[in-house]
Amino acid sequence: MKVIFLQDVKNQGKRGQIKEVPDGYANNFLIKNKKAVYASPENISKLNGQQNLEAKKAAEILEEAKQLKNKLASTKTIVQFSEHVGPDGRLNGSVTAKEIADQLAKQFNLTVDKRKLQLPQPIKTIGLHEVPAKLHTQVSAMIKVNVSELN
């Protein structure tokens, strides 16, 4: 019997896959537990429509990430911070990924999730820093951060 898997089933099939399985296994386990449905023409067309929708969504998300990368790559997009500096030239506090994401939203109206910023440790020195950001699995960008001394 041909079935369409609704979710991944170990050693049998992945979500969205159409596969021939034994009748008893299909009826007594897969369909009963809502892990698969019969591969009728109607269900196959639903699956194709669903896959097309998912592909369009993925393409839109990728395009948004590329646009955000272009905005971040602009020479004008430098996130500014003014912090108190100690006598040794180091910041009294630090600039974290959350603060960078907040300032991006505040200064440039760009929304970047703090978890996408790959800041190994918080910035503790003044000057211009580049922070890598993984906006999408296929799109990475560099965010320029300028930390200056607060007068």
Swiss-Prot record:
Entry's Gene Ontology molecular function annotations: rRNA binding; structural constituent of ribosome
Tree of life domain: Bacteria
BP GO terms, sorted: translation
Keyword line: Ribonucleoprotein, Ribosomal protein, RNA-binding, rRNA-binding
Record flagged with keyword ATP-binding: no
GO-annotated cellular components: ribonucleoprotein complex; ribosome
Protein name as it appears in the record: Large ribosomal subunit protein bL9
Record-linked InterPro entries: Ribosomal_bL9 (IPR000244), Ribosomal_bL9/RNase_H1_N (IPR009027), Ribosomal_bL9_bac/chp (IPR020594), Ribosomal_bL9_C (IPR020069), Ribosomal_bL9_C_sf (IPR036791), Ribosomal_bL9_N (IPR020070), Ribosomal_bL9_N_sf (IPR036935)
Upper lineage: Bacteria, Bacillati, Bacillota, Bacilli, Lactobacillales
Protein family according to the UniProt entry: Belongs to the bacterial ribosomal protein bL9 family.
Physiological role: Binds to the 23S rRNA.
Species annotation: Oenococcus oeni (strain ATCC BAA-331 / PSU-1)
